[in-house]
A protein has these predicted regions:
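Acidic-glycine-rich active-site phosphate/pyrophosphate-binding loop
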Residues: 127, 136-141, 271-284
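Hydrophobic beta-strand scaffold residues
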Residues: 70, 212, 267, 288-289
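N-terminal ligand-binding/catalytic initiation module
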Residues: 2-105
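Anion-binding alpha/beta catalytic cores of soluble intermediary-metabolism enzymes, centered on
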Residues: 9-20, 97-183, 246, 253-254
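Adenosine-phosphate binding glycine-rich loop
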Residues: 12, 16-28, 32-36, 45, ...
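Glycine-rich phosphate/diphosphate-binding loop of Rossmann-like nucleotide-binding domains
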Residues: 46-61, 145, 150-256, 260, ...
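Generic structural signal for well-ordered, non-membrane alpha-helical segments
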Residues: 15-23, 52, 56, 77-80, ...
Length: 321
């Protein structure tokens, strides 16, 4: 008489195992192709937010380790736009990152918020985060190249791209399928719809074939490639039918209800707070839990920088396409 073996408990995934191969590739490329003289990344910080300052320090440490020249410029808010324009014009600067939020919801003279205006003011040749209007528009339209000849790939937002790489590493993407179909049949719930993380992430996953339930505090929509669809699903029902749940709730008190998590689900936390009871989650059979994505995000930042360098500063184009 045979019996079915019991499913094992959940597994905690260290982001370093995903980030390290990218960092090694960056170091090797800079040493061999650029003779040790890496591209220059400028970070602009105009507020005292400790989380942003910590991220800036972390970025600088990783860049210096891997051969990228990194300079953090701390300025007053009123001087931020001028500092950004200066970095745009500096031929020795190959990438720019602004540490948001800078002005919060404060409106811009030009329409939208001041932070929106700053994002759109970064040159497409230096937008290492891929958040300016040009790259955002291409992302939502599923346009993957800068040029008509399709020799220069677009830059994608760092944290959403990091999550894609994590899902590839964990086998959620089906590499046997053509690009654009590797998530076909996969349901994913993203609990965040910010313009920085949740919305572009939902679009990227939908562009790869997934059905993505996008949840924020007031609504839930279904993202399919090129479509935003009303749905009768609730956060609970969406999570229960999802193979992947991604949490990005910027509130310390929020916890993902464990009864919403099915066996063998991938759970990824992108918030600065832990959105899940880790001990309880890891009791669910087959769960794979990624508590932090920062190391992969920084690796994607470096990857984007080298892609920008090849697209606009180096010919012929080589590895990072």
């Amino acid at each position: 008489m045979s019996s079915t073996p019991a499913a094992t408990a959940g597994r905690k995934v260290d982001a370093a195992e995903i980030a390290d191969p990218f960092s090694v590739a960056v170091r090797k490329y800079i040493a061999e192709e650029m003779h040790g003289h890496g591209p220059k990344l400028v970070g602009l910080l105009a507020h005292g937010d400790p989380a942003a300052k910590k991220y800036a320090e972390w970025t600088g440490k990783a860049c210096r380790r891997d051969g990228i020249r990194y300079e953090l410029r701390e300025v007053e808010k009123d001087d931020l736009l001028e500092a950004l324009e200066s970095a745009n014009k500096d031929s020795d600067v190959h990438g720019i990152i602004v540490y948001y939020p800078c002005f919060g919801a404060f409106p811009s003279f030009y329409g939208g918020s001041m932070d929106d205006f700053l994002r759109d003011s970064i040159s497409i040749k230096k937008d290492v985060e891929g958040l300016c209007q040009f790259y955002r528009g291409n992302l939502y339209r599923n346009i993957r190249y800068v040029d008509d000849e399709q020799t220069q790939k677009c830059v994608l937002p760092c944290t959403p791209l990091a999550i894609v790489k994590i899902l590839e590493h964990l086998g959620v993407y089906d590499a046997r399928q053509p690009h654009g179909e590797q998530l076909s049949g996969v349901n994913i719930t993203v609990i965040n719809r910010s313009d920085i993380v949740g919305r572009p992430l939902a679009a990227m996953l939908a562009n790869d074939g997934a059905d993505v339930f996008s949840v924020d505090i007031e609504s839930l929509y279904l993202f399919r490639r090129g479509k935003l669809i009303k749905t009768e699903e609730t956060p609970e029902t969406a999570c229960k039918k999802s193979r992947v749940i991604i949490t990005g709730v910027p509130v310390k008190s929020y916890k993902l209800p464990l009864e919403w998590v099915s066996e063998n689900t991938v759970v990824i936390n992108v918030a600065s707070f832990k959105n899940v009871d880790e001990e309880g989650l890891l009791q669910i059979p087959g769960v794979q839990y990624v508590p932090l994505v920062g190391k992969v995000t920084v690796a994607m930042l470096q990857r984007n920088l080298l892609r920008l360098y090849e697209n606009f500063h180096m010919k012929p184009k080589k590895f990072w396409q």
